[in-house]
């Protein structure tokens, strides 16, 4: 009887031990990731995300929309609180020249220009305001080039050699950064597509699974949906354009990730084969940014 009781107690202890080692399902919420900027959209961090039994360190890996309208207060916040030491700008050359970043403190600026068709061909259009741009998108929602942008944008980002070269430069530079010296921030225009793809790649390098990568991407949709929902659309094409180019479209993004997996086996394999991020480099990044 005593022996049986001892066995039961041992089993119970093992069960409790197993439960304490199980990583609880994390709840990803936009409010927990925002970094307090009021003059830049979609400004948030990867810090706090749980990867296995570790988590990403707070206040080191930041992402946002363009920083051209950064206020003095927000610039000070990035310089003093986050000690931003490098800005990675994924906007095309014409985008960044027409709206140059405000550089916080003594941060280093690196242009990683990744352009889509219109800018590269010299056919890009200047808009006086956001309403004018939205009006154009609605008017030409059925145009083949606009539809192609919606359906193939992430394929361009992940599979075109020129895009891959941009992300090679991103990782090569990031590996030279010492996190004890402060944060880095990367952005594009809205901080959701080119910057979002950089985030997905970095999360994969840090060991994140598809679920976490998609959860981070979806936060851009959560951020922009309140704005895009106010735009009146009349056709399915218009809805698709607004949901993809003004908000974020996780269905299209995940379809590209599926193509990556089909061709390379995993996003981490893709990073090694196409971006040149070796397993050893990934280990360096994990040592620096996980705790």
Name every feature range the model reports, one short phrase each.
Residues 18-185, 197-291:
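Cys-dependent protein tyrosine phosphatase-like superfamily
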Residues 190, 194-195:
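Ser/Thr-glycine-rich phosphate-binding loops at phosphate-binding pockets of nucleotides
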Residues 1-23:
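Bacterial Sec-dependent N-terminal signal peptides
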């Amino acid at each position: 009887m005593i022996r049986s009781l001892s066995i039961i107690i041992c089993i119970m202890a093992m069960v409790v031990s197993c439960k304490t080692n199980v990583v609880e399902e994390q709840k990803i919420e936009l409010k927990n990731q925002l970094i307090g900027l009021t003059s830049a959209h979609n400004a948030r961090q990867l810090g706090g995300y749980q990867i296995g039994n570790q988590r990403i360190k707070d206040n080191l890996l930041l992402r946002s929309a363009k920083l051209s309208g950064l206020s003095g207060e927000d610039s000070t916040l990035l310089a003093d609180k986050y000690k931003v030491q490098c800005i990675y700008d994924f906007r095309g050359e014409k985008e960044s020249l027409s709206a140059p970043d405000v550089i916080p403190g003594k941060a280093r600026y690196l242009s990683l220009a990744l352009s889509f068709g219109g800018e590269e061909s010299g056919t890009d259009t200047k808009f006086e305001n956001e309403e004018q741009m939205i009006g154009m998108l609605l008017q030409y929602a059925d145009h083949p080039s606009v539809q192609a942008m919606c359906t193939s944008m992430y394929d361009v980002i992940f599979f075109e050699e020129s895009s891959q070269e941009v992300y090679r430069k991103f990782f090569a530079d990031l590996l030279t950064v010492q996190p004890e010296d402060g944060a880095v921030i990367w952005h594009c225009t809205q901080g959701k597509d080119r910057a979002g793809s950089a985030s997905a790649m970095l999360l994969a390098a840090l060991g994140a699974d598809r679920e976490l990568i998609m959860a981070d991407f979806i936060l851009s949709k959560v951020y922009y949906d309140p704005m895009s929902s106010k735009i009146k659309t009349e056709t399915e094409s218009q809805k698709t354009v607004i949901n993809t180019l003004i908000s974020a479209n996780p269905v299209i993004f995940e379809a590209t990730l599926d193509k990556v997996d089909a061709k390379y086996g995993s996003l981490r394999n893709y990073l090694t084969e196409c971006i040149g991020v070796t397993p050893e480099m990934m280990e360096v990044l994990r040592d620096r940014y996980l705790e």
